Amino acid sequence: MRVRRLSLITLSIFWSLFLPLSSCFAAKNEIPLKEGAWNITLQINPPTSDFLPIVQMLCLSQTEPVPIPAKKEGCRLLTKEIEGNTVFWVAECREKEFVTRSVGNATYDSNKVEGAVQTMTSATGKETEMRTYTLTGKRQGNCR
C-alpha cells in the first residue's frame, strides 16, 4: 500500500511539472512579428542615384509575414519557410513581357524587420537582369 501511494504521489508531481513544460514546446511556432500596417523599404544594393528606394505600406500578420505585395495581379508566392525569427520566400510576378522572380528573407524583431531580396527579371529576347535589395521596415499601426 505504501509503495502504491508513493507511486501516485511521484506520478502526480511528474504530471504537474511536465504538462506546463510540454505546452511550452507544443506552442505554435510564431515569429516575433507584431501584426499590423508596416512601412517596407527596398533599397538597391549597393545604393545608386538612378534607383530610388521602393517604399510601400503592407498589412502583415502571422499568416502573411512575407513583406512583398504578392496579392498584386500576376504575382504569386511560390514558397514560404519560417526558421526562428526569419521568413524565407520565393515569389514570381508575370507581366506582359516580363517575368520577375524574387528570393528573399526577412528577420523580425517585434516592430522592425530587416532582410534582403534578390530579383531576376527576364524578358523575351533580353538578357536577365539581377538586382539585390536591402529590406527594412517598421510597424506603423493597425491595418485599415
Question: What name fits each language-model region?
Answer:
Residues F98-V103, A116-Q118, E129-Y133:
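Short, surface-exposed coil-to-beta transition loops
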Residues N39-R76:
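Short, solvent-exposed loop/hinge segments that bridge or flank secondary-structure elements
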Residues I40-L42, F88-E95, A116-S122:
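Short beta-strand segments that buttress and anchor functional surface loops
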Residues A123-R144:
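Edge beta-strand at a domain terminus
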Residues I9-P20:
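Bacterial N-terminal signal peptides
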Residues M1-L6:
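N-terminal secretory signal peptides that target proteins for export/translocation
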Residues V90-T107:
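Mid-chain, well-packed structural core segment of small domains
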Residues C24-A37, E81:
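N-terminal helix-cap/turn-to-beta initiation motif at the start of protein domains
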